[in-house]
Amino acid sequence: MSWRQVILLSSLSALVLLCMLQEGTSASVGSRQAAGEEVQEGMKQKIFMQESDASNFLKRRGKRSPKSRDEVTAENRQKLRDDELRREYYEEQRNEFENFVEEQRDEQEERTREAVEQWRQWHYDGLYPSYLYNRQNI
């Protein structure tokens, strides 16, 4: 077989295969469209409720009628959860600030101690023992 015959045969087989696949997909689209419409109807039924159910849903409890026990407990649980989260947040903020203040205070004390030590070394005349040994006990 020459290379021309091989190319002609392969292109012809590819053309036949594409034609068959195109007919198969066009036949399946029609059934999928019908199935898609059925699915959309099902979705509408899930999303939208009947008019009578909707009016009953809105009229279930008026503004001035007392809340049910379940509603009250759910609201109380939500409030308690919010209070706990708020308490934890402020406690964490307070701890971070206290740690920051403690670090700042320690750094300031260290700088002050070093400055006092340098002053004592500079002004020490050598006649007396150093300040540490010259403390007056009261």
Swiss-Prot record:
InterPro entries: UCMA
Signal peptide stretch: 1-27
UniProt keyword annotations, A-Z: Coiled coil, Extracellular matrix, Secreted, Signal, Sulfation
Coiled coil: 78-122
Region of interest (Disordered), ranges: 58-85
UniProt keyword annotation of Protein biosynthesis present: no
Subcellular location(s) of the protein: Secreted, Extracellular space, Extracellular matrix
Keyword flag Signal: yes
Tissue localization of expression: Detected in immature, proliferating, mature, columnar and hypertrophic chondrocytes from ribs, tail, vertebra and femur.
Biased composition (Basic and acidic residues): 67-85
GO cellular component terms, A-Z: cytoplasm; extracellular matrix; extracellular region
Any GO BP: negative regulation of SMAD protein signal transduction
One GO MF term attached to the UniProt entry: BMP binding
Pfam families recorded: UCMA
PTM summary: Proteolytically cleaved by a furin-like convertase to generate a persistent C-terminal fragment found in almost the entire cartilage matrix, and affecting osteoblast differentiation. Sulfated on tyrosine residues.
Function text: May be involved in the negative control of osteogenic differentiation of osteochondrogenic precursor cells in peripheral zones of fetal cartilage and at the cartilage-bone interface.
Sequence similarity: Belongs to the UCMA family.
Protein name according to UniProt: Unique cartilage matrix-associated protein
Originating organism: Rattus norvegicus (Rat)
Gene it is expressed from: Ucma
